[in-house]
């Protein structure tokens, strides 16, 4: 009896122990399943074509969608380097793919992890992927140095993805265009590369770049407009996300081109990379940071420069440096934010002439400067600013005073006299060369062209020609003369304006009168916005034309077309009424 009772007690203990073990295994399995299959992760943040920031944010490896938080491990090719990378806290592994024995009698066609000129390695791509996918959650960037490696590698990636093993973003990189200082062609064939990706592994982020070479005797050589436009021509129609690798030592001098490139698609980003021998300025990195949204640019930069850059970039008291030809994002408008939040302001001027002083409102926004000319062209004319009070301030004094004011501003020069156009642009160019223009600058006028030709206004062709020749780094802001708007914005008026502005690489903001929108061709605003990814519309209203109620419907209709790309140049009271209406709706 005692033995039976003892046996029963032992059996009970074993039963409880077995239940405990099974429960522990079940709990572990559930936790693992939840970790690997968090809601939305499998189809979104953890897919090979997912946004890298969304993926790392879902894992808690970055704290916000800021590409500066992403860290990189270079050339994780050999088994030793790969192991070191896997044991690090780096978030993305970058490795080079070549073909074993490339160009020799021993060429096998097997993708290996090696940077040219190396053609042998202790690590094949398959071994590398097995290790990285099986033991880490790090993002992956594969750099292809030869077109022969691309097809077999993408076949392998597709098989592993179909087996459910690739559950993270994959970046596919190759230099497909000749870039700065390259005298010979070493790039991967662009047509073949893009075709292979499209055929074999389209669900990945593309990383197409330019071959480059830094020459210390030509430090200012950089990417040309033609190089950047050719790249957009190649990949503008692909459905994938695209991140363009750009040599960081060359980016500042080519910023007008890369600013244009980023504006062409929300799918685009840049990845700035640094060669070990490149001289690099932290000011250049800060300039890029200031002129982009935080999710648009990754920084693959060496220490200690990277830490220095991060410290300065995240310093809220640092005075930023904005590109004069850039958009109002992120200076005055956050990505995806409402254009109604950007306010147009007119400075208060006391006195006149050289002793005049300017007072700015407490709020931030676009500073509207109605610009004329003092003197004639033959008398060394001076651009001046006309104010509602009748005071006159030289444009140079106005801009220099603005340079000393803290806060976020944009400048909107409205050319009131045709003769003031080129002298005003020349002044902008000179101040920019002296480092005294740190804000986006718009240059606009009511222009004469085609069906809206009216004497006394700036000729449309002259506006564009003067900008191109004297100071191209601006936003062009053309409007129609009031004399031709009796029937609103008719079809021919829109057609002629769009034909004039066709092919502009600068941003353009079409200036429209709110009172006339209700009498205009249906879809006028939508048609103007569709002309370019960089196009915006600014709706203005003169209170002498009537009260807010008379334009309320037109203003709300304009905002309904695109709340992010329509701006409002309104009296403060009207703007408050519109904000209240938007809030109620």
Swiss-Prot record:
Pfam families: Menorin. The keyword Transmembrane helix applies. The chain crosses the membrane at residues 14-34. It is a single-pass membrane protein. It is found in: Membrane. One of its GO terms (cellular component) is extracellular space. Keywords: Membrane, Transmembrane, Transmembrane helix. Belongs to the menorin family. PANTHER family: MENORIN (DENDRITIC BRANCHING PROTEIN), PROTEIN FAM151A. This is Protein FAM151A. It comes from Pongo abelii (Sumatran orangutan). The gene is FAM151A.
């Amino acid at each position: 009896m005692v033995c039976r009772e003892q046996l029963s007690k032992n059996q009970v203990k074993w039963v409880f122990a077995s239940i405990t073990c099974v429960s522990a295994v079940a709990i572990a399995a559930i936790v693992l399943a939840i970790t690997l299959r968090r809601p939305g992760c499998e189809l979104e943040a953890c897919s090979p074509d997912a946004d890298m920031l969304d993926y790392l944010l879902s894992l808690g490896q970055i704290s916000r969608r800021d590409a500066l938080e992403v860290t990189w491990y270079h050339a994780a090719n050999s088994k030793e380097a790969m192991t070191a990378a896997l044991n690090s806290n780096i978030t993305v592994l970058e490795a080079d793919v070549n073909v074993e024995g490339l160009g020799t009698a021993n060429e096998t066609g097997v993708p290996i992890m090696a940077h040219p000129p190396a053609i042998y390695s202790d690590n094949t791509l398959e071994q590398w992927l097995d290790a990285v996918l099986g033991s880490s959650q790090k993002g992956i960037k594969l750099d292809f140095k030869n077109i022969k490696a691309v097809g077999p590698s993408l076949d392998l990636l597709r098989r592993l993805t179909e087996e459910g093993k690739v559950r993270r973003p994959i970046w596919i990189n190759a230099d497909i265009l000749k870039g700065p200082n390259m005298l010979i062609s070493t790039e991967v064939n662009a047509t073949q590369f893009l075709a292979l990706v499209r055929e074999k592994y389209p669900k990945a982020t593309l990383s197409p770049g330019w071959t480059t070479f830094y020459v210390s005797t030509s430090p200012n050589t950089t990417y040309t407009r033609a190089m950047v436009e050719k790249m957009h021509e190649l990949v503008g129609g692909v459905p994938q996300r695209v991140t363009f690798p750009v040599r960081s030592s060359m980016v500042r001098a080519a910023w007008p081109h890369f600013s244009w490139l980023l504006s062409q698609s929300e799918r685009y980003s840049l990845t700035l990379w640094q060669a070990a021998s490149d001289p690099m300025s932290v000011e250049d990195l800060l300039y890029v940071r200031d002129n982009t949204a935080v999710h648009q640019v990754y920084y693959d930069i060496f220490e200690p420069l990277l830490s220095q850059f991060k410290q300065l970039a995240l310093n809220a008291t640092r005075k930023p440096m904005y590109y004069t030809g850039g958009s109002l994002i992120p200076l005055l408008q956050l990505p995806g934010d409402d254009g109604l939040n950007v306010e147009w302001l007119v400075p208060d001027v006391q006195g006149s002439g050289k002793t005049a002083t300017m007072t700015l409102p407490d709020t931030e926004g676009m500073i509207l400067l109605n610009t004329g000319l003092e003197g004639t062209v033959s008398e060394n004319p001076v651009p001046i600013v006309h104010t509602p009070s009748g005071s006159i301030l030289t444009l140079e004094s106005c801009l220099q005073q603005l340079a000393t004011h803290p806060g976020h501003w944009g400048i909107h020069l409205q050319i009131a006299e045709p003769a003031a156009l080129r002298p005003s642009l020349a002044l902008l160019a000179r101040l920019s060369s002296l480092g005294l223009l740190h804000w986006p600058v718009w240059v606009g006028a009511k222009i004469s062209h085609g069906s809206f030709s009216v004497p006394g206004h700036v000729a449309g062709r002259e506006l564009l020609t003067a900008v191109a020749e004297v100071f191209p780094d601006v936003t062009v802001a053309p409007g129609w003369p009031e004399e031709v708007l009796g029937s609103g914005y008719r079809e021919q008026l829109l057609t002629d304006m769009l034909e004039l502005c066709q092919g502009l690489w600068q941003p353009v903001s079409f200036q429209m009168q709110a009172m006339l929108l209700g009498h205009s061709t249906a879809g006028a605003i939508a048609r103007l916005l569709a002309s370019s990814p960089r196009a915006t519309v600014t709706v203005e209203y003169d209170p002498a034309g009537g009260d807010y109620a008379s334009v309320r419907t037109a203003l709300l209709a304009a905002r309904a077309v695109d709340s992010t790309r329509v701006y409002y140049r309104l009296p403060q009271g009207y703007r408050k009424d519109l904000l209240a209406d938007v809030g109620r709706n």
